[in-house]
Amino acid sequence: MGTPSVSEASALLSSGGGPLLLPKQKGAKLYCSHRHGRRLRTSGAHRNCRSRSRRSGADFRTRTSLSRRSRLILYAGSLVPRELTECAKAGATIRSSASMTLEEQFALMKEFYDRGQLVVRLHTGDPCIYGAIQEQMNFFDQYGMHYHITPGISSFQAAAAALQSQFTIPERVQTIILTRGEGRTPMPEKEKLSLLARSQSTMCIFLSAGVVDQVQRELLEHYPPTTPVAACYHLTWKDERIFRGQLQDLAKIVNENHLTLTTMIVVGDTIDNREGLSRLYSHQFKHLFRK
């Protein structure tokens, strides 16, 4: 709490040590792509349009956000609450990309970019993890549109905080797997859940509430039935809900509570674990800062 994050450090580096357009804040995480001069920049944005949001560890003297300065806000309407665009300046164009094709999105962004106007592209979580931004970068590269991506907080990280759990345990679990269940998009054969489950690592499963029965079957091939699980719905949203249980009941938990694709499934003994001490602060452990 109050510890500078990777996103904050990246933003400070990008600004050359100057004031931040958007201070570090705590809430639902988004990403903004915007053009400044002849450059498209991407930086972390949060649920900050209204003062009801919680904030921590930041200097709020600079209150101007990217969204308040933009002429176009193109947000992922299927994942981003409309209320997060309410801080836009009067007269700004606000569009949901949910019903748009890629070509329509590109044409709209380039139209504003070519006018020299600020463009904001809102994504949830970290856009580099299941963010579908590769095709956008291809487009920007094709037309020589410069851009910058600032890392942010993914839903698996938000899940760890909401669960108040450390996803690694000294000498027991040192691996975190980010993956998804097989749906309409096939999984590579070597990345099947049943294969990944062999390590019994902490597994964070994206986009898989709709195939939870299959997910449970594959995980049970290697994880014990009593392995702790958590189904985390709408993490960081106002209607966030978290359901804990055991792996043998995962499908029941998800189905009975009508959880949707915006659910992060976490599996592993690290959930609610309070055993195992790190050697980092042991009086017997010597390192650069303590000899």
Please annotate each region the language model reported.
Residues V6, P19-T150:
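Class I S-adenosyl-L-methionine
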Residues L79-P81, C128, S155, V211, ...:
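Alpha-helix capping/helix-boundary segments
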Residues L12-L13, G17-G18, K24-N48, E104, ...:
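A contiguous loop/helix-start segment that scaffolds small-molecule binding in enzyme catalytic cores
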